[in-house]
Amino acid sequence: MRMLPSYIPSPPRGVWYLGPLPVRAYAVCVITGIIVALLIGDRRLTARGGERGMTYDIALWAVPFGLIGGRLYHLATDWRTYFGDGGAGLAAALRIWDGGLGIWGAVTLGVMGAWIGCRRCGIPLPVLLDAVAPGVVLAQAIGRLGNYFNQELYGRETTMPWGLEIFYRRDPSGFDVPNSLDGVSTGQVAFVVQPTFLYELIWNVLVFVALIYIDRRFIIGHGRLFGFYVAFYCAGRFCVELLRDDPATLIAGIRINSFTSTFVFIGAVVYIILAPKGREAPGALRGSEYVVDEALEREPAELAAAAVASAASAVGPVGPGEPNQPDDVAEAVKAEVAEVTDEVAAESVVQVADRDGESTPAVEETSEADIEREQPGDLAGQAPAAHQVDAEAASAAPEEPAALASEAHDETEPEVPEKAAPIPDPAKPDELAVAGPGDDPAEPDGIRRQDDFSSRRRRWWRLRRRRQ
């Protein structure tokens, strides 16, 4: 006795009603896929060092752009259905819930929307693409179930045991047609076809597993994992298109999606080869606002360390017993370094408090552009801190104060090599006197105190950059 093949039955309907509100299976599948992609993408982005929830902020731009792009691609490649002779018209073209999204347009405009979101959040676009790539292909697999409920995008007729039964559906007007979106199955089989939606669903799940394995096995970054996703999907889509028999735009007898799959596959492979190897540093995933917050939190300690380092490099050894630095001078320099360090830390704490919403005075900020505009010559001339002048004046011979002062302020005199300062005699207290800000008649009292906090910080950061 010959057994009849067991075919895969189609769902009896693709839409249900909650009162007057229609619930379409296609829309439910698309929304479910988007949610799954966002959950997976946000978890992966957080694991790479990104801020939790940032994926959802970017999705506010990417998802609408993707839906619009998918619909536009569908209309462009299947325009006869809507705008040809006997077409459904513009109103049907706008009913996106009836189905009809082109993945190529969805990915293209979705990436553009993601780029806008990444710019606003301050993270590189390739980082996000690598994080969401597995979730996107899994979302496509879930979305293919919507084609199953709509009885669309099927292949040629077949006698294979896994063939898909397409039923006649009775639409609200009473006609029995096989492609009615709002109709209910009559139980009568119209034809048996290749379940191309199922082939692509299985392929997308395999691509999802492959991407997860590649990402864990190798160090993939800079958008290369997204390139693998595009290449793998295009290879599978090209094969599936060869089995489809539904109406589509043809070029030289070949479906337009086959051409698209080929060209996009080549572009993805080229990008994988040319893209930088390795993976981005976790700090690049924090976003601009998070990087600023982290920098402000570290600023007090960093600026204090920079102040001490710059003072030490400018003044030289200040320990007791140094031939060029009497103990009183060393103690004076140490005291001034400590005072300035405390001042830097206090001002930085004020900045952190401002960020947290406390009422504090505004502090002048210094941009990187101001620092980079400084010429190397300016850096060399401004590198010594203000207290270096005190140290040099204190280490000079006391018997020649007028000569030193005139050399320091006379711009017409040529520079002469510095002479080693004589060792002061402890028996002569006058030689141990520390020059004060008002000891030099050519230097008004307090002129060294006129630099504000911003100029000191610029000087310290310049010194630090030079040492690095």
From Swiss-Prot:
Residues that, per the record, bind a 1,2-diacyl-sn-glycero-3-phospho-(1'-sn-glycerol): 144
Compartment(s) where it occurs, according to its Swiss-Prot or TrEMBL record: Cell membrane
Pathway annotation from the record: Protein modification; lipoprotein biosynthesis (diacylglyceryl transfer)
Region (Disordered): 349-468
Entry's Gene Ontology molecular function annotations: phosphatidylglycerol-prolipoprotein diacylglyceryl transferase activity
Coiled-coil segments on the chain, per record: none
Keyword field contains Transport: no
InterPro entries noted in UniProt: Lgt (IPR001640)
Protein name as it appears in the record: Phosphatidylglycerol--prolipoprotein diacylglyceryl transferase
Stretches with biased composition (Basic residues): 456-468
EC number: 2.5.1.145
Membrane topology reported for the UniProt record: Multi-pass membrane protein
Gene symbol of the encoding locus: lgt
Physiological role: Catalyzes the transfer of the diacylglyceryl group from phosphatidylglycerol to the sulfhydryl group of the N-terminal cysteine of a prolipoprotein, the first step in the formation of mature lipoproteins.
Key words of the record: Cell membrane, Membrane, Transferase, Transmembrane, Transmembrane helix
Family: Belongs to the Lgt family.
The organism's place on the tree of life at top rank: Bacteria
Positions with biased composition (Low complexity): 391-406
A GO-annotated cellular component: plasma membrane
Biased composition (Basic and acidic residues): 445-455
